[in-house]
């Protein structure tokens, strides 16, 4: 393996598998487009992962385009990208690491693809400008403090595929007044909820298909 910067993006290249991982570089900024393949020494490498902390504290990063070749987004990959307003996660991605988008305070909307089955701890914590989250029917678990301190979030839809929600998933989401749950009250009550999911929230109503539950 070796590391190389190609057209402004730093990669770790694996000559055996011919795959590439986007890795940490301090000065990513503006609008970044990650290609599906990169070439070095006449060999083509498939970009399959965004590594842990790859864009950590890149405060001037505004948007990122992730190719359909990427299957994994690492831990804290975009943490503290305070100017990041737009990101599209392709449906090739199957896992999103802990805290991957935490503290992205300018991010207003996020769509999680159906290829993902669980949302990791702290994944979108402290995204204080987040207004809209799309959680697909493929999701079975929501981690601890996943949306904590998303202070602009007023409503979120949770599919009936979800079987567990971690402690403090909506901690200090001060304006979260409505959770739209696609299942019944009985299905909601059967979800494994670790401690209190909305601590620090004045009042939240879960709207189920057959009635409401007050948290």
What are these regions (language model features)?
Residues 171, 191-196:
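A structural signal for leucine-rich repeat
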Residues 1-4:
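N-terminal low-complexity, Pro/Thr/Ser-rich intrinsically disordered segments
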Residues 198-200:
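Short mixed-charge
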């Amino acid at each position: 393996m070796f590391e190389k910067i190609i057209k402004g993006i730093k990669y770790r290249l694996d000559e055996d598998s011919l795959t590439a991982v986007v890795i940490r570089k301090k000065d990513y900024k503006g609008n970044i487009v990650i290609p599906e393949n990169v070439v070095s020494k006449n060999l083509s490498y498939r970009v399959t992962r965004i590594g842990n902390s790859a864009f950590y504290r890149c405060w001037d990063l505004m948007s990122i385009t992730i190719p359909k070749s990427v299957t994994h987004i690492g831990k804290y990959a975009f943490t503290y990208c305070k100017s990041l307003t737009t990101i599209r996660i392709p449906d090739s991605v199957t896992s999103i690491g802990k805290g991957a988008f935490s503290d992205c305070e300018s991010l207003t909307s996020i769509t999680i693809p159906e290829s993902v089955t669980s949302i990791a701890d702290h994944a979108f914590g402290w995204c204080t400008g987040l207004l809209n989250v799309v959680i697909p029917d493929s999701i079975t678990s929501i981690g601890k403090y996943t949306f904590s301190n998303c202070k602009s979030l007023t409503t979120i839809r949770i599919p009936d595929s979800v079987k567990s929600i971690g402690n403090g998933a909506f901690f200090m989401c001060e304006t979260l007044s409505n959770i739209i749950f696609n299942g019944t009250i009985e299905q909601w009550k059967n979800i494994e909820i670790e401690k209190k999911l909305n601590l620090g929230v004045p009042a939240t109503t879960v709207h189920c298909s057959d009635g409401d539950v007050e948290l």
